[in-house]
C-alpha cells in the first residue's frame, strides 16, 4: 500500500514539471479562457437587467463610489469622476433642452483629445444618442461621406478645425445639419457655440427616461475604418460590443490603482474602447495627451505616475529612436497594451526602458475575432487558445493574393491552411461571435461576409488579414490583403488615394499601393502613374493637390511613371510585382519621384535619397 501511496505522491509532485515540459502554456491558456468566460458570463447578466447595464452605468457607479478620485488628467488639469459626471449632465441637458435632441439622434464629434471629448461622449450616453467619431485628419469629400453615412443631425467640432468645417458647411446647411463649435465664441457665420449653453444649465442627474429605449443592440458609437470600398466605413458599435472592447484591459489585470496613459486619438477604437472604457470599468485614472510626443512621453509618465501605456508599433519605435537618457528607467510603467509591435523594437524597448509587460493583441474595430499575446512571446500578436476556439470558430484559409480572393477546392469550398502556413483569417458569424456591419447601406457589410466557406449556407467574417499560426499555437500577423494598407498607425484605402490623385489634370490613370520600408512598421504609400498624352508631369502641382486633400499618412511618398498600367483579367490593377519592386532607383528603370516636404514638390528619386531613407537619416 505504501509504495502505491509514494508513487501517487511522487506523481503529484512531478505533475507541474510534466505540464511545464509537455504543455508549457496550459495554465496560462486556462487562466486566460476563464477570464474571458467570466467576462462573457457577466456581460450576459448585464443584458438581462432592466434597464440593461451599459458602460454608462459602470461610470455612474464609479462616480457614486469614488466621486473625488481623479478620472482624467490633461496637461495641468485634474478632473474627478464627480466633476466629469456633473459636466456630462450639463451636456445632456443642453443637447436635450436647447437643441431638442432625443434618444436615437446621432451626433458627430469632430475634435482631438481633450477632456471635453470624454464628457460630451458621456453626455450623449445619458441622452441615449449614438456618437459618430470623426477622424480630425479627413477633409472635404471624405468628411462629408463620414458625416452623411451615420445620419447625424448635429456636428460638434473643435474651433481648431474651423477651416475644415467651413469647407463643408454649405453642404451641411443644405442637409439641415446644425453645426456647433465646442467653444463659447464663433468666427464662422452659420456655426453656433455649445459651451455657453452647457454652462447655463443644471448639473443635476438626468432622468433615466431620456435613455429608456437603450438596449444591448442599440447603436452606441460609429467608428470609422478605411476599407476596400475607398471611402471610410462607419463600423456600428452597439452597447453589447462596447463591453467586449474592455476585454483587453480586464484580461491584462488593470485595476483601480492604475493610471492609463494614451496619446492615441479618441476617435480610434483602441483609445476609446480599450483605454477610456477599460479605465471606467475598473475605476482607474486616464491621462490624456492631445498628440503623441516622443520627447515628452516619459516626462508625462513621470508627471502623472503612469502605470499602463497604450501604443501602436510605430509609437514604441519612436521612443526607442530618441537619445538615451540616464533616467530612461525612472518611471512606474508596468504594462503596455497595443498592437503592431515588431519583434526587434519589442526587445529594444524592454531592454532600454525596463521590464514592462507588453500585451500585444490582434483585433479590428468591426471584426468578430481577436487574439491576445498573454504569454508575451516577442513577435506574436496573440495565441490560438484551444478553449477559445470552441466558442469563436475561426480558421485560416488559403488566399490567392494576386487574384485577391480565397482559394476554393473542386467542390467550391475554402481550404484550411496547416500550421506554419499563411492564410486569410475568417471567423464564423454566430450569436456568440456576431458581425454587426457598417452604417450607410448593406453593400459594405455584405462585402465583409464570406459565404459557403466550408459548407453550403455558412457565413464567415472576412478579416482581410493574412496571419500564421505556428506549431506552438502563437499567432503572427503577415499582411493585409485587398486595397488597404497601414502606415503610421492608420489604415489607408488605396482606392480613395487613387481617386484624389486622379483628379490632377495630367494624370490619366493611377495605381496606388503600399511598399515596405526597412526599419518601419506597415507600408508606405506609392503610386504608379500614367501621364495623359500631350501633358507633362508637374511635381509642384501634384504636391499641392495631395497636401490639400489627403492627410499626411495617406499621401503617396513615391511615384513611378509608367507607359502602361497593368490590369488583371477582371480589370483590377496588378499590385504584387510593384509592391515587391518597391522604390529602389537602381532596380527600377521607370522614372521615380520622391515627395519632398521641404521643397513642397515631387523631386526625382536618386540613390542618395534612397540610401538616406534606408539609413534613416531621412525621416518619412
From Swiss-Prot:
It is found in: Endoplasmic reticulum membrane; Peroxisome membrane; Cell membrane; Microsome. Pfam families: AMP-binding, AMP-binding_C. AMP binds at residues 222-233. Residues 1-4, 128-267 are lumenal. It comes from the Eukaryota. It is a multi-pass membrane protein; Peripheral membrane protein. Strong expression in liver and kidney (at protein level). Lower expression in brain and testis, no expression in skeletal muscle and spleen. Shows uniform distribution in liver acinus. It is an enzyme of class 6 (ligase). The chain crosses the membrane at residues 5-27, 107-127, 268-288. Disruption phenotype: Conditional knockout in liver results in decreased long-chain fatty acids (LCFA) uptake by hepatocytes and decreased peroxisomal long chain and very long-chain acyl-CoA synthetase (VLACS) activity. GO terms for molecular function: arachidonate-CoA ligase activity; ATP binding; cholate-CoA ligase activity; enzyme binding; fatty acid transmembrane transporter activity; long-chain fatty acid transmembrane transporter activity; long-chain fatty acid-CoA ligase activity; phytanate-CoA ligase activity. It catalyses: a fatty acid(in) = a fatty acid(out); (9Z)-octadecenoate(out) = (9Z)-octadecenoate(in); a long-chain fatty acid + ATP + CoA = a long-chain fatty acyl-CoA + AMP + diphosphate; (5Z,8Z,11Z,14Z)-eicosatetraenoate + ATP + CoA = (5Z,8Z,11Z,14Z)-eicosatetraenoyl-CoA + AMP + diphosphate. The modification N6-acetyllysine is found at residue 291. The modification Phosphothreonine is found at residue 577. Its EC number is 6.2.1.15, 6.2.1.3, 6.2.1.24, 6.2.1.7. Keywords: Acetylation, ATP-binding, Cell membrane, Endoplasmic reticulum, Fatty acid metabolism, Ligase, Lipid metabolism, Lipid transport, Membrane, Microsome, Nucleotide-binding, Peroxisome, Phosphoprotein, Transmembrane, Transmembrane helix, Transport. The keyword Translocase does not apply. Belongs to the ATP-dependent AMP-binding enzyme family. This is Long-chain fatty acid transport protein 2. It comes from Mus musculus. The gene is Slc27a2.
Amino acid at each position: 500500500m505504501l509504495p502505491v501511496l509514494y508513487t501517487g505522491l511522487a506523481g503529484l509532485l512531478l505533475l507541474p514539471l510534466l505540464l511545464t515540459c509537455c504543455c508549457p502554456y496550459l495554465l496560462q491558456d486556462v487562466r486566460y479562457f476563464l477570464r474571458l468566460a467570466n467576462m462573457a458570463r457577466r456581460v450576459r447578466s448585464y443584458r438581462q437587467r432592466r434597464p440593461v447595464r451599459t458602460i454608462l452605468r459602470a461610470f455612474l457607479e464609479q462616480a457614486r463610489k469614488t466621486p473625488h478620485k481623479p478620472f482624467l488628467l490633461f496637461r495641468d488639469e485634474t478632473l474627478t469622476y464627480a466633476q466629469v459626471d456633473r459636466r456630462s449632465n450639463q451636456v445632456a441637458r443642453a443637447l436635450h433642452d436647447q437643441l431638442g435632441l432625443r434618444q436615437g439622434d446621432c451626433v458627430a464629434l469632430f475634435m482631438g483629445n481633450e477632456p471635453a471629448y470624454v464628457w460630451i461622449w458621456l453626455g450623449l450616453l445619458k441622452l441615449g444618442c449614438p456618437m459618430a467619431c470623426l477622424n480630425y485628419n479627413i477633409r472635404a469629400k471624405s468628411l462629408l461621406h463620414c458625416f452623411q453615412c451615420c445620419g447625424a443631425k448635429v456636428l460638434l467640432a473643435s474651433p481648431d478645425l474651423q477651416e475644415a468645417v467651413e469647407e463643408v458647411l454649405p453642404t451641411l446647411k443644405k442637409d439641415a445639419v446644425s453645426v456647433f463649435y465646442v467653444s463659447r465664441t464663433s468666427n464662422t457665420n452659420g456655426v453656433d457655440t455649445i459651451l455657453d449653453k452647457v454652462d447655463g444649465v443644471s448639473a443635476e442627474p438626468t432622468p433615466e427616461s431620456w435613455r429608456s429605449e437603450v438596449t444591448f443592440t442599440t447603436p452606441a458609437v460609429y467608428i470609422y475604418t478605411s476599407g476596400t470600398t475607398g471611402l471610410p466605413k462607419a463600423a456600428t458599435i452597439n452597447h453589447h460590443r462596447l463591453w467586449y472592447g474592455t476585454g483587453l484591459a480586464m484580461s491584462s489585470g488593470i485595476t483601480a490603482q492604475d493610471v492609463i496613459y494614451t496619446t492615441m486619438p479618441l476617435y480610434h477604437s483602441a483609445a476609446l474602447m480599450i483605454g477610456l472604457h477599460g479605465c471606467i470599468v475598473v475605476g482607474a485614472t486616464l491621462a490624456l495627451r492631445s498628440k503623441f510626443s516622443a520627447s515628452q512621453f516619459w516626462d508625462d509618465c513621470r508627471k502623472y505616475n503612469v502605470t499602463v501605456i497604450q501604443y501602436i508599433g510605430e509609437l514604441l519605435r519612436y521612443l526607442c529612436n530618441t537619445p538615451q537618457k540616464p533616467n530612461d528607467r525612472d518611471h512606474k510603467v508596468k504594462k503596455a497594451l497595443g498592437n503592431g509591435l515588431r519583434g526587434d523594437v519589442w526587445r529594444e524597448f524592454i531592454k532600454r526602458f525596463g521590464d514592462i509587460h507588453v500585451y500585444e493583441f490582434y483585433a479590428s474595430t468591426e471584426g468578430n475575432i481577436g487574439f491576445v499575446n498573454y504569454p508575451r512571446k516577442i513577435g506574436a500578436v496573440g495565441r490560438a487558445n484551444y478553449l477559445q476556439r470552441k466558442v469563436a470558430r475561426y480558421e485560416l484559409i488559403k488566399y490567392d493574393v494576386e487574384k485577391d480572393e480565397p482559394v476554393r477546392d473542386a467542390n467550391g469550398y475554402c481550404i484550411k491552411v496547416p500550421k506554419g502556413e499563411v492564410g486569410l483569417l475568417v471567423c464564423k458569424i454566430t450569436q456568440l461571435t456576431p458581425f454587426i456591419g457598417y452604417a450607410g447601406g448593406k453593400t459594405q457589410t455584405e462585402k465583409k461576409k464570406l459565404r459557403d466557406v466550408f459548407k453550403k449556407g455558412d457565413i464567415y467574417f472576412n478579416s482581410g488579414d493574412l496571419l500564421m499560426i505556428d506549431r506552438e499555437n502563437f499567432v503572427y500577423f503577415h499582411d493585409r490583403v485587398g486595397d488597404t494598407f497601414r502606415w503610421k498607425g492608420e489604415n489607408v484605402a488605396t482606392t480613395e488615394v487613387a481617386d484624389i490623385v486622379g483628379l490632377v489634370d495630367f494624370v490619366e490613370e493611377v495605381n496606388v499601393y503600399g511598399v515596405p520600408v526597412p526599419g518601419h512598421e506597415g507600408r508606405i504609400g506609392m503610386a504608379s502613374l500614367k501621364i495623359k498624352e500631350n501633358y507633362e508631369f508637374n511635381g509642384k502641382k501634384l504636391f499641392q493637390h495631395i497636401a490639400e486633400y489627403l492627410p499626411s499618412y495617406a499621401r503617396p511618398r513615391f511615384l513611378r511613371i509608367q507607359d502602361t498600367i497593368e490590369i488583371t483579367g477582371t480589370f483590377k490593377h496588378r499590385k504584387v510585382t510593384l509592391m515587391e519592386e518597391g522604390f529602389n532607383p537602381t532596380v527600377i528603370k521607370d522614372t521615380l519621384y520622391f515627395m519632398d516636404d521641404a521643397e513642397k514638390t515631387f523631386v526625382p528619386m536618386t540613390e542618395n535619397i534612397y540610401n538616406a531613407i534606408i539609413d534613416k537619416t531621412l525621416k518619412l
